[in-house]
Amino acid sequence: EIPALAQRFFQIAPKTKLVWLHLCECTGCSESLLRSELPSFDELIFDFFSLEYHETLMAANGTKAEELLEHVLEEDFILAVEGGVAAIDTFFLTIGAQGESGYEILEKLAAKAKAIFAVGTCSSYGGIQAAYPNPSKTCGISEVLSQKVVNIPGCPPSDINIIATLSFFALFGVLPELDEQNRPVWAYGKCLHDMCERKAKFESGIFAEHFDDEAAKNGACLFKVGCKGPYTYNNCPKVKFNAKTSWPVAAGHGCIACSEKNFWDEFGNYEKPMANIFSYAKLCNEELKQEFFLEEQIKILEQIDFEFESNIKLILQNIAKNKLGALLVENYKKSFEKNYAFIEQNFDENPMPSKDFWKYLEISFILVKGAFLKDKNDFLIAAKNYAFKHASPYDFKLNMNAEKPKLDVSKSFRMTLIYLCGGLDFEGVAYSILKAFEDNIAKISSLKAS
């Protein structure tokens, strides 16, 4: 809802002129906008903005519509683009009697616009049109424009994310704070998974096996049936869709990461966890060489505060100290009886503090395989053979404010239990752990360099 002070501003200030351009898209983003309630769509276009051009909604058509577009070029306006652009093979989209390509019209409008907003995943990153093999060579508009573009991804984005981003510029005359992908931080700055109403079940290792099972109906996590929430940055659980009616995960289907780059190829079209057995594309993570952590990276770990308990029996006991953790350990025990029995047989209850990076990998290997890690290269090979690009998040805690950097990994072992119960395989766990170490060591290295 727009605050009273902002509403007063919109009442007395000249209305911001808005041009809404359609390129390679399905009009789903416009559909999302039409379902706004506070403000309603009619309030939005009559009281807050002056909608100068929108091919689906405007009364004018044909040459009259083209005349309106030419006229608006002489005035101040902001540009919202729905849909990707075919900038190479431009014949994939031609518009109007003059046969202009979508790319030509986009360039013409972008050159005059005070601000440019890519509304939806198609205009932000190319979207479904850019899915393999991408015959139209569609891409996001920022790839072909020299001007700054604010990305509002989603297939579609919520009405709130669209309206609030446009309204911010109309109110303040500047763009909102953006992340490294030029997305508004207020909307895309947090992981969707962390706001999900099903997260407690995720933390407990309670997963739906099928969409129609009792667990799913009772709020179980949908990770095992393909939810990609842990890899997605969006505020869907908070703002929802259709005037805050609901959102996909609450309605019973997993997130498909529709606001992420290349979502259709990398996330969206399979309802399984990202385990190698479900991969439909062959990918070798070439950056994970045999020397991945053998030299400089391990030296950095040796120079910082890095210590953890390495007795797995005690690790499991610590995880089980709270209600969610106790459920998680119990579910791990049920799903991996052999592994749990191996731990019970081979570990006592004496503390075993360790600073050894390889010991962390060995613990993780035991949790996955129920056996000791005989060759440390087996872990690296598994990570290299992971057939997906995206690591599953591990909650390492890096404190850069201490006398020397401190990397706390003590609570992260539970993530291995969670992912195993959720259907992730050894390759996925191995890759995710190594990427977590790599990312944190990179932060430490950058601090040392500065």
Q: Could you say what each language-model-derived stretch is?
A:
Residues 1-236, 248, 264-269:
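Iron-sulfur-associated redox domains of electron-transfer enzymes in respiratory
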Residues 2, 263-266, 368-375:
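Short helix-capping/linker segments at secondary-structure and domain boundaries
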Residues 116, 299, 449-450:
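Short glycine-rich phosphate-binding loop at a beta-alpha junction
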Residues 160-164, 310, 359-362:
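Residues on a specific face of well-ordered alpha-helices
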Residues 241-287:
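Extended hydrophobic packing segments that form well-structured cores
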Residues 286, 290-303:
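Gly/Thr-rich phosphate-binding beta-strand-loop-beta motif of the actin/hexokinase/Hsp70
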Residues 288-289, 322-448:
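A contiguous, well-structured pocket-lining segment that forms one wall/lid of small-molecule binding clefts
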Residues 305-318:
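Catalytic cores of nucleotide-enabled group-transfer and carboxylate-activating enzymes in metabolic
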